[in-house]
């Protein structure tokens, strides 16, 4: 029997889930939080390159002059994203270096070395809400927390293998385990997306059940290949860098793979 279309885990999750109260609170907290962040003026190519290299996620407005309305638009959303670096450049050499031929807002992210552009009609019709949504949905990091917003960026990433750490963020061991998970993520940058799934969030139960995991088996690692729905799981007591590395290497080599082709096993996928 054929497998379902690829990437169904995240796509169907998006179509059936609303933002959890925790996610809404987090977005509100970031927009209401302290700080007086301002976009950095990037006057030459070297400055732009260093600016992008220093940030996990950077947003740059490339404008042909400094009077375009989008300049004030960037200023209006900066405080909503305390963990994103913002820059503005009107230097022709910088625009040429990044293949910019018209007013454009670009998001650069370290995790998959991606440049995503808002240009043309998308740029002309942009407002603060659309710009915020663009940043939110593409704000992927070495470790990205899984929710209805970030799932969009995960779905659109060119990296087809995703490693999930499924763990309750309220756990006393969470911060230490997350740190080691982040260290492991550096070993697979550009090859595997590392994702955190908070098992304490009710809306994540369907994503967890996709991997046939029970709450008693958590925390756990789950690895998933979007191109052909191959996946595998590993219940753990704690995150160890070497353990994560071996699990990922084994999956990349085709060891210990599971594939959901049985009709009775497709139920949870359909319901996601």
From Swiss-Prot:
InterPro entries per UniProt: Thioredoxin-like_sf
Motif position, Prevents secretion from ER: 269-272
Glycan attachment residues as annotated in the record: 99
Alphabetized UniProt keyword annotations: Endoplasmic reticulum, Glycoprotein, Signal, Unfolded protein response
CDD domains tied to this protein: PDI_b'_family, PDI_b_family
Record GO biological process: protein folding; response to endoplasmic reticulum stress; response to unfolded protein
Domain of life: Eukaryota
Name of a matching Pfam family: Thioredoxin_6
One cellular-component annotation, GO: endoplasmic reticulum lumen
Chief place where the protein resides: endoplasmic reticulum
Protein location: Endoplasmic reticulum lumen
Endpoints of the signal sequence: 1-25
Region: PDIA3-binding site, residue numbers: 229-232
Stretches assigned to the Thioredoxin domain: 38-151
Subunit composition and interactions: Interacts with PDIA3.
Similarity comment: family membership: Belongs to the protein disulfide isomerase family.
Function according to Swiss-Prot or TrEMBL: Specifically binds unfolded proteins and may recruit protein disulfide isomerase PDIA3 to unfolded substrates. Binds protein substrates via a hydrophobic pocket in the C-terminal domain. May play a role in the unfolded stress response.
Protein name, as recorded: Endoplasmic reticulum resident protein 27
Organism: Bos taurus (Bovine)
Gene name tied to this protein: ERP27
